């Protein structure tokens, strides 16, 4: 599992988020981060206090995104998996996305199709790629299609690395400032300016304007939308639960 390393000496079991963000010093910053942070879960009480007030949340994926921005060196690059909920989420998520697009160049979002992590979760996911040090001017989107004849992924027919050859050919090289201005739009690729993203309150869950939508009765189209609605409801409930928990904790401290 660890590429033939029988006894890894530099791997430890711990909660990275338990360390206060301010304690990560310049010597610990890195050039490249590739990660699939846990998502869909909530951190234990008190973990959020390790982060600045404007970013405090108990949602694991959100805190990891804040941590990544901290530990990347200037000019460093990151690629990570995040759920749709991060893209369309509001409140703390909006503030985190605003910081990301201000401090980093979020140049590419690869929108993965439904079922990539089946059977473990049906949550739709995305691949985000950014570099630190220059602000975002535009975000390129690439809608990863199913292979010919497929309508979903599963444990016996998972997504394969060979399917990303099209993205690799399209990717291209950035200019000296780190922007991908020479990329071409297509049926699966499009760009959105930072002004448009700001006017949409940093909602990054943007549809492909170049694709003809399926009919309203298409199950393969409706199911992901239904699942997204369920995720939005779950996030709202989690946010309300967290606010209620904080209010009760404050009341308890005030009466003790």
Regions found by a protein language model. Give the residues of each.
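Short, conserved SAM-binding/catalytic segment
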Residues: 1-6
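Phosphate/diphosphate-binding loops
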Residues: 9
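A conserved structural/catalytic subdomain of Rossmann-like adenosyl-cofactor enzymes
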Residues: 13, 18-256
């Amino acid at each position: 599992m660890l590429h033939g390393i029988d006894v890894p000496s530099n791997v430890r079991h711990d909660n990275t988020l338990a360390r206060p963000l301010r304690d990560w010093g310049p010597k610990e910053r890195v050039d490249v981060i590739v990660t699939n942070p846990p998502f869909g879960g909530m951190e234990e009480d008190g973990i959020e206090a390790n982060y600045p007030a404007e970013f405090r949340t108990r949602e694991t994926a959100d805190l990891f995104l804040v941590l990544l921005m901290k530990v990347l060196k200037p000019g460093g690059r990151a690629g990570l998996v995040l759920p749709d909920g991060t893209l369309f989420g509001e409140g703390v998520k909006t503030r985190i996305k605003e910081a990301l697009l201000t401090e980093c160049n979020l140049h590419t979002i690869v929108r993965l199709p439904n079922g990539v992590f089946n059977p473990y979760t049906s949550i739709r996911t995305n691949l985000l790629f950014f570099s630190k040090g220059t602000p975002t001017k535009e975000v390129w989107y690439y809608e990863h299609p199913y292979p010919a004849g497929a309508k979903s992924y599963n444990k016996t027919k998972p997504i394969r690395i060979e399917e990303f050859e099209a993205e690799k050919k399209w990717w291209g090289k950035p200019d000296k400032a780190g922007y991908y201005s020479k990329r071409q739009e297509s049926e699966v690729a499009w760009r959105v300016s930072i002004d448009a993203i700001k006017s949409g309150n940093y909602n990054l869950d943007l549809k492909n304007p170049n694709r003809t939508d399926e009919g309203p009765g298409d199950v393969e189209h409706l199911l992901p939308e239904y699942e997204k609605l369920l995720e939005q409801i779950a996030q709202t409930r989690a946010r309300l639960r967290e606010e209620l928990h904080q209010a009760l904790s404050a009341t308890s401290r005030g009466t003790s």
